[in-house]
Every structure is written in C-alpha cells, then in structure tokens.
C-alpha cells in the first residue's frame, strides 16, 4: 500500500566544502538550484517497514539503472545525429514526426528521488576496504549480536559501491539514499553534494520536533569536522555517516542518521576507519525526546529539498516493499 502526499515547500574537497558552506551560511534557504525542469520536483519514497538491507540496495540500483539507461539512449541519439550531419555535410534532415519523437526522448529526465529506509542489522564495506577485508573480519561482524537485540536477525556483511570503509545499518537508524543528476543543478559537483547532505543533517538535528505534541525542536548542536559525517559534543561523537557514489553524474547512497540505534553495534568495532571514535544517537543526546526514524526521515527530506532549491516535494509512503517489483 502507498500514499502520495504533495507539498510545497570541485575537485578539491576542502575548497569545495568551504565554498558550499559559504553559500549555506549566506543564504540559509539553498546551496544550489535546479537548471533543468525535471529537477524542479523531488520525490520522496518513504519505506515505513523495516526491510533487509539488500532489498533496499536493489530498489536503489533499479532506480539508478533507469537514470543511466535514459542517459545511454540520449547519448546514442546525439552520436547518431552528429554522424548523419558529418556524412551529409550538414544537409541531413528528419521529418516532423521523427523530430517530435527525438525531442521527447531527449527531454526525458527523471526527477530527483530520495529513498528512506530502516534496515535489518547489516555491516557494509565501502570501496576503500573492498580488497582488504578478510573472512575472519567478516565473521566477527556477522557473529556480533548485542544482548538487547536477540530478537533481531543476525547481522550480515555486504560490500557496496559507496565511498568510505565499514559502517553499520540497522534498527533505529534512518538510511537515506539520494538519486539525482548533478548536471541538472547549478554548479553542483559531487563534493558539494556531500556538503549539502551534511548541512541538511545538521538542520534536521536542530529543527526536528522533540515530539508531535510540541513545537519545541531537538536543537542538537551538530557540526562537521575534517572527517566526513556529522558530529556532536564538539566533534567528539559521530551521529551520522555520509557516503555517496556517482556514475555519469547520477548519484546514489547518502547518509545514515542514528535515531535510537543500539550503539554497541558500532562502538564495539572501528567504524568508517576512524580509530578511538564513538558513535552516538539522537536518543542518547536527547533522552527526553519522542522521535522515530520516520519523523527524522520526513524532516531530513524537507531540509534537503530547501538546500537543493527545489520548490515542490512529493512524498509516497510505502509499507509494501514489493510494490516496486518489476512485472513478470
């Protein structure tokens, strides 16, 4: 079942981060803006039931593949038109019907999409450790079950194509995947997308309501450091991990925010390659708050929409993960 809700609403990392942050500081509303009509509406697919990590990865890859397939078709058309122009020395013509079809194909560009999930316990390995992870290390992750998590499935280890090293996804954590074409936004390289994700997370931790019955915000004082991610307690504890992947300007992966996660899943191991670093959660920082992964998901997507300069947000709440299965 699903429900649809419509709302209005650099090559050098350090240089890019400063430039993007400066934009954010001087104009709180946005860090970029759409330059293509397709990017003017953002679609939020909000999965409301906990699912296996691989299922979420499969959904993400299906949507990314659709974006890439459209790019492939458009590139082939462009190459063919150039070839015809060269062969006929600028005299080649196409009839009106062919032109209408080609114009429609060339105008096809998917909207930006944000997927939000809560996953079963999973450790994921980024590209940095793809060739160095040993069977013994994987076994250690997959055999770890906190005393309070006996009713949850045993953790799995999954290799993924995002940047970074090992991180954890599981109950009490909202995982947010951002699928968009960087070229449909003004001056928006991948490193600036990372900065945008971090700032959206910081604003989420500050502005999300303590509970449904009050307008009082969490007002968590979060920040960025020299290490990617979002931190609290003056940079001593990490509350959100960030990692993206880009193929032909199409992005995937994004951010994981710890809401009421069992922190022993992360603090019993070295996460993200950061030694002597502790992970925290919203509930550890604000034990009197009544928030859940879904309220944080909605809050983050609103903040990200503003920072992207997008005016229209459409949300589809999905409680049946099989709704996106391909027809046989």
Curated annotation (Swiss-Prot):
GO cellular component: mitochondrion
Active site (catalytic residues): 272
CDD domains: LipB (cd16444)
Key words of the record: Acyltransferase, Mitochondrion, Transferase, Transit peptide
Compartment(s): Mitochondrion
Molecular function GO terms recorded: ligase activity; lipoyl(octanoyl) transferase activity
Domain of life: Eukaryota
SUPFAM superfamilies: Class II aaRS and biotin synthetases
Sites where the protein binds substrate: 162-169, 241-243, 254-256
Catalytic reaction annotation: octanoyl-[ACP] + L-lysyl-[protein] = N(6)-octanoyl-L-lysyl-[protein] + holo-[ACP] + H(+)
Site (Lowers pKa of active site Cys): 238
Annotated family: Belongs to the LipB family.
Other known facts: Present with 1200 molecules/cell in log phase SD medium. In the reaction, the free carboxyl group of octanoic acid is attached via an amide linkage to the epsilon-amino group of a specific lysine residue of lipoyl domains of lipoate-dependent enzymes.
Name recorded for this polypeptide: Octanoyltransferase, mitochondrial
Species, as recorded: Saccharomyces cerevisiae (strain ATCC 204508 / S288c) (Baker's yeast)
Organism classification: Eukaryota, Fungi, Dikarya, Ascomycota, Saccharomycotina
């Amino acid at each position: 079942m699903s429900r649809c809700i419509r709302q209005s609403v650099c090559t050098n990392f350090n240089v890019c981060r400063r430039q993007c942050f400066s934009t954010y500081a001087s104009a709180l509303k946005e860090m970029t803006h759409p330059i293509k009509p397709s990017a003017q509406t953002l679609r939020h697919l909000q999965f409301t039931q906990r699912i296996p990590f691989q299922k979420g990865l499969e959904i993400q890859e299906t949507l990314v593949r659709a974006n890439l397939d459209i790019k492939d078709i458009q590139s082939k058309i462009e190459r063919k038109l150039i070839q015809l122009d060269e062969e006929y020395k600028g005299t080649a013509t196409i009839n009106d019907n062919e032109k209408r079809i080609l114009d429609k194909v060339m105008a096809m560009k998917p909207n930006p999409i944000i997927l939000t999930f809560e996953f079963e316990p999973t450790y994921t390995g980024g590209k940095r450790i793809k060739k160095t992870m040993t069977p013994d290390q994987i076994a250690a992750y997959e055999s770890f079950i906190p005393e309070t998590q006996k009713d949850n499935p045993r953790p799995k280890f999954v290799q993924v194509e995002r940047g970074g090293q090992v991180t954890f996804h599981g109950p009490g954590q909202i995982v947010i995947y951002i699928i968009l074409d960087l070229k449909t936004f003004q001056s928006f390289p991948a490193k600036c997308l990372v900065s945008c994700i971090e700032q959206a997370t910081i604003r989420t931790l500050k502005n999300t309501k303590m509970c449904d019955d009050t307008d009082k915000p969490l007002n968590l004082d979060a920040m960025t450091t020299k290490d990617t991610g979002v931190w609290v307690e003056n940079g001593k504890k990490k509350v959100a991990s960030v990692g993206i992947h880009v193929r032909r300007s199409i992005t995937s992966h994004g951010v994981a925010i710890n809401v009421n996660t069992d922190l022993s899943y992360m603090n019993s191991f070295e996460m993200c390659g950061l030694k002597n670093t502790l992970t925290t959660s919203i509930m550890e920082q604000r034990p009197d708050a009544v928030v859940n992964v879904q309220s944080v998901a909605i809050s983050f997507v609103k903040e990200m929409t503003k920072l992207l300069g997008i005016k229209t947000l459409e949300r589809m709440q999905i409680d049946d993960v099989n709704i996106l299965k391909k027809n046989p």
